[in-house]
């Protein structure tokens, strides 16, 4: 670059920094880039691997959508539990007014340390979310759900009144404000969304999500969660078989998927995933009905091995670490905002 151009650029950069503050513009020479993307585990080992970076990326917007009773809130609460386990501070904006503290505690959430808001209107919910993010003191915010973010005009109006596009405009405006603050404060914001059917669709999927298109564009990760079957013991139903597809991913290759079990009253069966993925990666050996690790038998039948891993969390953590290292998705936790932990999974 010529001297004249260099001087002109230096003057422009100085003017920008004077007007908008230091760091408003920077050269990507590597010194300003973070070596590793910071993530928060989803609580599902398989999904962490499918995401390609070991969890949900911080400083980004994530959308989780699916049919009713598919495990959307359960997945979010599992992620909240993982964030708290590593010293993170979490907030739950419950627009549906359906938060169950007893169930959350069973999933490992420290309910007494969770900030809960049950707003009256969509505007109030999103303003609370923005204020929490701008504070810089929150690591993760969950909004449950976009469909329940009802605009004030609709609440104050009469039944049957037409309010076309109100919610979509509300979401679009809020996300324009939120995005910059989320990146600056390195906060993870998760929006839970519901599925609706488009009328008159002849070709392609008739399914769509609520709240317009803004969330689809602003989200760095979009997860489609579905219940694929039931887990039974005789006639008793113990849980759901669940599949999550990574529909959009700006931080790793998309279109991967993960399958795991959600057990009623326990949440995601982490030990079950360890067994399945451990066998697939040749970390756990399976011979007939017997499973062995490091040459020692650990149980006959998957259910017995799951119980053994629960009783031996240090071995379970060791297998988890080996699987993550083998797949190149070791998690990177922010220093300073999160306390050191012993690495144990919350009790279920």
From Swiss-Prot:
Transmembrane segments: none annotated. One of its GO terms (cellular component) is cytosol. The lineage of its organism: Bacteria, Pseudomonadati, Pseudomonadota, Betaproteobacteria, Neisseriales. ATP binds at residues 66-73. Gene3D superfamilies: P-loop containing nucleotide triphosphate hydrolases. One of its GO terms (biological process) is SOS response. This is Protein RecA. GO terms for molecular function: ATP binding; ATP hydrolysis activity; ATP-dependent DNA damage sensor activity; damaged DNA binding; single-stranded DNA binding. SMART domains: AAA. NCBIfam families: tigrfam_recA. Can catalyze the hydrolysis of ATP in the presence of single-stranded DNA, the ATP-dependent uptake of single-stranded DNA by duplex DNA, and the ATP-dependent hybridization of homologous single-stranded DNAs. It interacts with LexA causing its activation and leading to its autocatalytic cleavage. It comes from Neisseria meningitidis serogroup A / serotype 4A (strain DSM 15465 / Z2491). Its main location: cytoplasm. Belongs to the RecA family. CDD domains: RecA (cd00983). Keywords: ATP-binding, Cytoplasm, DNA damage, DNA recombination, DNA repair, DNA-binding, Nucleotide-binding, SOS response. It is found in: Cytoplasm. InterPro entries: AAA+_ATPase (IPR003593), DNA_recomb/repair_RecA (IPR013765), DNA_recomb/repair_RecA_CS (IPR020584), P-loop_NTPase (IPR027417), RecA-like_C (IPR049261), RecA-like_N (IPR049428), RecA_ATP-bd (IPR020588), RecA_C_sf (IPR023400).
């Amino acid at each position: 670059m010529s001297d004249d151009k260099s001087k002109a650029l230096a003057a422009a950069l100085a003017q920008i920094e004077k007007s908008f503050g230091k760091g408003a513009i920077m050269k990507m020479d590597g010194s300003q880039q973070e070596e590793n993307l910071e993530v928060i585990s989803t609580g599902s080992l398989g999904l962490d691997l499918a995401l390609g970076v070991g969890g949900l990326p911080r400083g980004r917007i994530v959308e989780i959508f699916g049919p009713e009773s598919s495990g959307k809130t359960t997945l979010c609460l599992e992620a909240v539990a993982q964030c708290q386990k590593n010293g993170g501070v979490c907030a739950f904006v419950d627009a549906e007014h359906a938060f169950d503290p007893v169930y959350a505690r069973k999933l490992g959430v420290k309910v007494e340390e969770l900030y809960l808001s049950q707003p009256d209107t969509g505007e109030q919910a999103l303003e609370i979310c923005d204020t929490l993010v701008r504070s810089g003191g929150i690591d993760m915010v969950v909004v449950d759900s976009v469909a329940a973010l009802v605009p004030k005009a609709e609440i104050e109006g009469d039944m049957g009144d037409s309010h076309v596009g109100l919610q979509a405009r509300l979401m679009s405006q809020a996300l324009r404000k939120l995005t910059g603050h989320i990146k600056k404060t390195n906060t993870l914001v998760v929006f839970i969304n519901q599925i609706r059917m488009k009328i008159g669709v002849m070709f392609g999927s008739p399914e769509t999500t609520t709240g317009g298109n803004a969330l689809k564009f602003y989200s760095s990760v979009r997860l489609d969660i579905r219940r694929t079957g039931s887990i039974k013991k005789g006639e008793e139903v113990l849980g759901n078989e669940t599949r999550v597809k990574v529909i959009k991913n700006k931080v790793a290759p998309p279109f991967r998927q993960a399958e795991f079990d959600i057990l009623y009253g326990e949440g995601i069966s982490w030990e079950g995933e360890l067994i399945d993925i451990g066998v697939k990666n040749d970390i756990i050996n399976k011979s007939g009905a017997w499973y062995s690790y490091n040459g020692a038998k650990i149980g006959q039948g998957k259910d017995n091995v799951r119980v053994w891993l629960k009783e031996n969390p240090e071995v379970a953590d060791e297998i988890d670490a080996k699987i993550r290292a083998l797949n190149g998705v070791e998690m990177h936790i922010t220093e300073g905002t999160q306390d050191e932990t012993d690495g144990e999974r919350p009790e279920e």
